[in-house]
A protein has these predicted regions:
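Active-site phosphate-binding strand-loop segment of PLP-dependent enzymes
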Residues: 1-63, 69-71, 217, 221
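PLP-dependent aminotransferase class I/II
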Residues: 1-4, 9, 13-15, 22, ...
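Short glycine-enriched loop/turn motifs at secondary-structure junctions
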Residues: 61-65, 152-155
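A conserved catalytic-core signature of glycosyltransferases
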Residues: 65-66, 107
Length: 242
């Protein structure tokens, strides 16, 4: 079971872990967007058998280039992952399996080490900004703002709202106002060409497809100001109502 902690908010890990335990299925946490997020006082990335983090530059903890990290509580997974990342080696010139060149280079490690000490502060700033956005947008007709879940810390890697109609028109008009907006993500996984062999077609997963048609990401970064958020929201409210 892969639990994707999308945009920095945890999935419902209590229910997921119950199902996994009942059927003896390992849980993999996709924590790529959830550096420092918590679920019931536990850090995201500490709940599954394996957890994956991304250090892509746009992430909450981003490298200078690219990178990522796997963490696990399972020693067998640990040993195999270490081999796979380094050409399948267990020692110098000793290759047990066919692996990859997936080592985090030292330059990226230095950048990440320097930025790590600021992560909690940046996460708090993102959380504060997300709450401010939510407070302004919570009652605006024509859109749905994120909901803050109890017993969780949302790090707002992305601040995404749902535009209930004419999203593409909203995007163009927001850009005319100088507001950069993006779609995360426009194509549901089951409709990606890479998975066409699975046999899915449009209409098979209507909720996923609806989300992809409505989702819109607003500007979000640790140092965004209240004035900037207010401007974004003022523009969005006028456009959505129009």
């Amino acid at each position: 079971i892969i639990s994707v902690h999308l945009y920095g908010q945890s999935g419902n890990m209590e229910d997921i872990l119950k199902i996994a335990q009942k059927y003896d299925i390992p849980v993999i946490e996709d924590a790529a967007q959830a550096h420092g997020s918590t679920y019931k006082q536990k850090k995201i990335g500490s709940l599954g058998k394996v957890s994956c983090f991304s250090f892509y530059p746009t992430k909450g903890l981003g490298a200078f280039g690219d990178g990522g990290m796997i963490v696990t509580s399972d020693e067998e997974v640990n040993v195999r992952a270490r081999m796979l990342r380094d050409y399948g080696r267990t020692g110098r010139y000793d290759h047990k399996i066919i692996g990859f060149n997936s080592r985090l280079d030292t330059v990226q490690a230095v950048v990440l080490s320097a930025k790590l000490k600021y992560l909690d502060e940046w996460n708090k700033m993102r959380n504060d900004a997300g709450r401010y956005y939510c407070n302004i947008l919570k009652d605006v007709k024509g859109l749905i703002a994120p909901k803050m879940k109890e017993n969780q810390t949302h790090t707002f890697q992305t601040f995404a709202v749902r535009i209930l109609k004419n999203r593409d028109i909203v995007i163009e008009k927001m850009k005319e106002k100088g507001v950069g907006v993006l779609i995360h993500y426009p194509i549901p996984v089951h409709l990606q060409e890479a998975y066409k062999d699975a046999g899915y077609k449009k209409g098979d997963l209507p909720v996923s497809e609806q989300m992809a048609d409505e989702i819109l990401s607003l500007p979000m970064f640790p140092h965004i100001t209240k004035e900037q958020i207010e401007y974004v929201c003022d523009c969005l409210k006028v456009i959505v109502k129009g």
